Design a protein with these regions (language model features):
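N-terminal intrinsically disordered/low-complexity leader segments
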Residues: 1-15, 26, 214-223
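An amphipathic alpha-helix adjacent to DNA-recognition modules
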Residues: 14-22, 55-79, 128, 132
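Hydrophobic/aromatic-rich alpha-helical bundle segments in the mid-to-C-terminal region
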Residues: 2, 128-136, 145-202, 214-221
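Short hydrophobic clusters on alpha-helical segments that form packing/core surfaces
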Residues: 16, 20-28, 99, 205
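Helix-turn-helix
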Residues: 19, 27-61, 65-66
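Hydrophobic alpha-helical connector segments
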Residues: 79-112, 159-166
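Hydrophobic/aromatic residues within well-ordered alpha-helical segments
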Residues: 59, 66, 70, 92, ...
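Amphipathic alpha-helical segments used for helix-helix packing
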Residues: 107-132, 177-183
């Protein structure tokens, strides 16, 4: 599956709401939630400070928008459309293609990752919402696929260990975005490279799943 570059969030930057989100993303990622004032954000966006209340309710609402909206359609939404009962190789390809799609947004991803790292150090509670709305649905879908593969219950700890390991391959391209850009920038240089990356990660994940199957057979846990 070859996909074109996703339109960047800033492509709609003439919209006043989008201008506020982009200004907030930059300032929150640079200064943190406490360090960036609503006045400063409004000035950077060329907006009246009252627009923050109008569009987002308050500073916390603006922070939540900056935390996730620039990534575009949430990967969790795309993953929800994947049929976990289809052949495993097809499901894995669809999963990684959806998961990696935000990388096609370029610089905005770098700023979002910077903000996410800052959130880990200076927590505001935004991660709790992200886990519930984005990460948990992805994890549950992958666990369902793997549990079905091994005729195992969804609370099987080894299935969960494998699911976390599989998705960890893709997560690195987000949290290690700057590192990858230094060590091997060609891997995420353009939409075609990202599509190829999704295909390769699906291939690697299938090998990991086969290895887990071999372990289960050797221990008499699966036929």
């Amino acid at each position: 599956m070859i996909a074109a570059a996703l339109p960047s969030f800033s492509a709609t930057a003439e919209d006043p709401r989008t201008k506020l989100v982009l200004a907030a993303l930059k300032l929150f990622s640079d200064k943190g939630f406490e360090g960036a004032s609503t006045r400063e954000i409004a000035d950077a966006a060329g907006a009246n400070i009252s627009a923050i209340r109008y569009y987002f309710g308050d500073k916390a609402g603006l922070y939540r928008a900056a935390f996730s909206e620039p990534l575009g359609d949430q990967p969790a939404q795309a993953c929800a459309e994947i049929d976990p009962n289809q052949p495993l190789d097809q499901a894995l390809q669809a999963f990684f293609a959806a998961f990696l799609a935000p990388l096609k947004r370029g610089e905005e991803v770098r700023m979002v990752m910077k903000l996410h790292f800052r959130e880990m150090i200076e927590p505001t509670g935004a991660w709790t919402e992200v886990i519930d709305s984005e990460i948990r649905p992805q994890h549950d879908m992958l666990v369902h696929m793997l549990a079905r593969r091994f005729d195992a219950p969804p609370d099987d700890l080894e299935v969960k260990r494998l699911a976390v390991s599989v998705v960890g391959m893709a997560v690195h391209y987000f949290v290690g975005h700057q590192v990858v850009n230094v060590l091997a920038p060609q891997l995420i240089a353009n939409p075609e490279a990202i599509d190829l990356l999704a295909t390769r990660l699906a291939f690697y994940a299938a090998a990991m799943i086969d290895a887990e199957g071999a372990r289960r057979r050797a221990e008499g846990l699966w036929r």
